[in-house]
Amino acid sequence: MLTAERIKFTQKRGFRRVLNQRVDAYFAEHGLTQRDNPSMYLKTLIIVLWLFSAWAFVLFAPVIFPVRLLGCMVLAIALAAFSFNVGHDANHNAYSSNPHINRVLGMTYDFVGLSSFLWRYRHNYLHHTYTNILGHDVEIHGDGAVRMSPEQEHVGIYRFQQFYIWGLYLFIPFYWFLYDVYLVLNKGKYHDHKIPPFQPLELASLLGIKLLWLGYVFGLPLALGFSIPEVLIGASVTYMTYGIVVCTIFMLAHVLESTEFLTPDGESGAIDDEWAICQIRTTANFATNNPFWNWFCGGLNHQVTHHLFPNICHIHYPQLENIIKDVCQEFGVEYKVYPTFKAAIASNYRWLEAMGKAS
């Protein structure tokens, strides 16, 4: 496998320069800031109230257990909304211009059970730099359970992957929780990319918050009088719902019929295009005119915009989309968007089905 140092995007067509000029002009003309937006603060407040109201309902409402499980599902969707909107922006330094605020809000990923430190490395660096390049973009690897890239070796079980992947989504949050610990204490790298060393305080924080997670997910309900089966079922319903929502949304960004999977030259490591254009080639949007998805997804249905401007708060993405479309048209770059969530899901299904067949 080529090392990251050898992968080079060799073209400089001026696309990025023109795009940056247009986007900077938009913010200047309208007197807007890229981060620290009052409308984002309001959105955060609404989601936080939703999240804690759902949690309080699950723990304290005098309702029968099946209704409480419905509350667990609502809680899971609120957790997903917080992750998409607040945690994701913060970990990309797109929520605030104050890095300390971003770090504190970004650590909410840890309280969901996922290390924000490891996430920033594998997502911000590996995924956003080497999008859809097998062996470097961890998020298309699938840890051998699924085949997303045509460059990945085929095994027989993959022919059913378009079906069983939905079952895998259910267990992904628990996998993240455990795999973080394994990566830090044992493996120490993603593929050939060595994880930056943890400082002692960072390592203690990662492991300590994992223990704290066990406390409030399992210990608190037990202390309030719930039985062990009730706690296990409630936690499972919550995190399985969270897993299927989060994984589905992220899959609709790059694992589609219209998105490309890039292969560097085997000797030079060159990719004969501009990096910014490669982000558009490997990425697609969905349902960008739908108010619900625009609000709920935290800009993750505007993935093209997000990959080009990950440090800009997602509330600006709908306005930036037209700027990006215009520049793409000027440079002859195909801009990919699925008109509906259903259309993107169907494309993802067909791609997984195609990848499940032997080459």
Curated annotation (Swiss-Prot):
GO terms for biological process: lipid metabolic process; unsaturated fatty acid biosynthetic process. The gene is desD. The keyword Iron applies. Signal peptide: none annotated. Its EC number is 1.14.19.46. It comes from Synechocystis sp. (strain ATCC 27184 / PCC 6803 / Kazusa). It is an enzyme of class 1 (oxidoreductase). One of its GO terms (molecular function) is oxidoreductase activity, acting on paired donors, with oxidation of a pair of donors resulting in the reduction of molecular oxygen to two molecules of water. Disulfide bonds: none annotated. The keyword Heme does not apply. It catalyses: a 1-[(9Z,12Z)-octadecdienoyl]-2-acyl-glycerolipid + 2 reduced [2Fe-2S]-[ferredoxin] + O2 + 2 H(+) = a 1-[(6Z,9Z,12Z)-octadectrienoyl]-2-acyl-glycerolipid + 2 oxidized [2Fe-2S]-[ferredoxin] + 2 H2O. A motif (Histidine box-2) lies at residues 123-128. It holds the Pfam family FA_desaturase. This is sn-1 linoleoyl-lipid 6-desaturase. Keywords: Fatty acid biosynthesis, Fatty acid metabolism, Iron, Lipid biosynthesis, Lipid metabolism, Membrane, Oxidoreductase, Transmembrane, Transmembrane helix. The histidine box domains are involved in binding the catalytic metal ions. The record marks 314 as: Important for the regioselectivity of the enzyme.
